[in-house]
Amino acid sequence: MLNKNGACRRTAGLVLQLCMFLVIAMGKILCYDNCMMKNILKNKKIWKIICILAIIAYTLKNLFVGADTDEGYGIMVGYRLAMGDRLLLEMWEPHQTSAIFTAVFIRLFVMLTGGVNYLNLFLRLIFFPIQAGVSAFLYKTIRRTVPQMDENVAALMGLLYYVTTPKSIFIPEYSNLHNWFFALMVLCLLRYFGSKDSEGRTVAGKLRWLVLAGIFMTCDVLAYPSMVLVFLCCLVFLLVRRSERKWKELCAYVLPCVASAAVMFTYLLSYMTPQKMLEMAGEILGEGSHQTTVGEKLLGWGSSLGEMAMILLCALLVSLGIRWLIEKVWKKKLPGLLQLPGMLFFVIVFLIQIWFWLFSSFNAIYPQLLLMAVSLTGCYTYLRRDKTEKLFYELILLAFVNYFSVLLLSNWGPMLLVTYLILGAVAGLVCLGDYWQKENTAGKKAIQILCLILVLGNAFSYTWLILGSQEYHSYVIQNVRGINREGLRAGILTDYMTAYRYNNNLAVWPEAVPDGSTVLYVGPSQFYCMLGEHKQASPDTICSMIYDERLLDYWKINPDRYPDVVVFESCYGDIAQEGENSFIWNWLMEDFQPAERKDYPYITVFMR
């Protein structure tokens, strides 16, 4: 009862803190002179310099600061494939097909350097140029398909994509690979269906863009298999669309997908039968950390979506209340650009988002409410206000299909996955910008400010907080106190304890785990197995792995993977999994029967 009352008091305190923050912030905004709001972008050079500095800070911080077990998983699954483990048969990771792309970079690095020193940093160096390239392609595509849009607005949309990633992870792993391939596929479709001349007239697209879209769609399915739903939606779009070239368009889009799928299945069938492939697919789908009933999943989605809807609804009601109070009761006008439909709502949502970044318990970048708000408002604008940008409205719908497809395979809730709506937000900005410019002479400036808010806000959120810290919601300035000195994470700055633990494990690993061992690592940080030359005894390396009977199935199919060394994550001999109710501990004592136990500060090693 005391705990319940304490939780209620904490919740009430946070709500009160949020209300006070909003009142003070909105008071400041509404008290500003109209001239300030009208001229906020007057000095474009200063704002360009601010944007450049924000992008530099964002890039440098995320290149050198922060480390996370999710990032380690993304590297480890690629490393397994690069070192010769086979898909499906020896690798049971749920995201293993995405490792095809990661493994290329890892294999190249290992060939050039002979080891994994600085590998994490190298993969981050690969990430940022690719992210910048997709952002530049987005900018050029917006300029080609929406020629009436201001060049600065299109540039800000490109920058918004650059500073928004699905997670606070900056390597070519499954979430970022999906983000790139989905964006490239969509942008190729826009190039084909939405190309316009300088006078705004639609011109016939070239079929090569549909071919490229099909190739990127295939890559996207490999990065995130549930994206097959996006493929089906695009297929339906091509089928129902009236076109004299319908069958050519279908062939151009579908044949690359079919050909790529045929190559993939041919490769898999080169070392296993179709029956074995189906058996392995069942084992992978049975991965414990992603196993929930339909009811549990729907309940979790409903709770998260309800929370998000409540926040956005409250923001909308507050914005309508402020407008009514000022215009109807006080008989005055809102300051400057806040008069535009929806602008006050976006400002309030942004202020709530800032509060989350500064004071809430959410880690790093979440929950990105403004991306959801802009996407939904873009839909509303097209349906109820201005039906000019039909193609971008359809893009918003496709972005929501993408969002739902990610939810199907993820063990994260809807509020944490809003970052996958980045292209929906960009399309929403296009719909809003076109409508605002028709409604008000200040519409051009308003969409510039909204884009600027999004860019600088996201650059701040991804820069302000450190990922992977021992403290869940921790600030970079206060917490960066350590450096990972050698090995996989060499050169990366983290909080003191994360670096200390890594460096300690790095120092003891050669003594604790002999090279050539077949190692079962029990714990979320399986990337430590990359500190030596080992064979992987675990079916998968996901950081949320459940250690259950799947291990026995894996060793029955792959008897050469039965471990001779078992490593538990621990704290000075204290093992979380120790106890008679633990499957892995019972297996260790009854079947593995260790002959030797070695306790180190952060790992405990058992040998036969």
Residues covered by each model-derived region:
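Aromatic- and kink-enriched transmembrane "portal" helix at the membrane-lumen/periplasm boundary
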Residues: 120-124, 158-180, 353-364
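Specific aromatic-rich, kink-prone transmembrane helix
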Residues: 177-200, 209, 216, 372-375, ...
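Extracytoplasmic catalytic/substrate-binding loops of multi-pass membrane glycan-assembly enzymes
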Residues: 63-77, 86-105, 117, 272
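Hydrophobic alpha-helical membrane-interfacial segments at the cytosolic entry of transmembrane helices
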Residues: 49-54, 245-269, 300-317, 332-349, ...
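Transmembrane-helix motifs of polytopic, lipid-linked glycan transferases
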Residues: 125-147
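Perimembrane helix-loop-helix junctions
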Residues: 194-199, 229-262, 320, 324-329
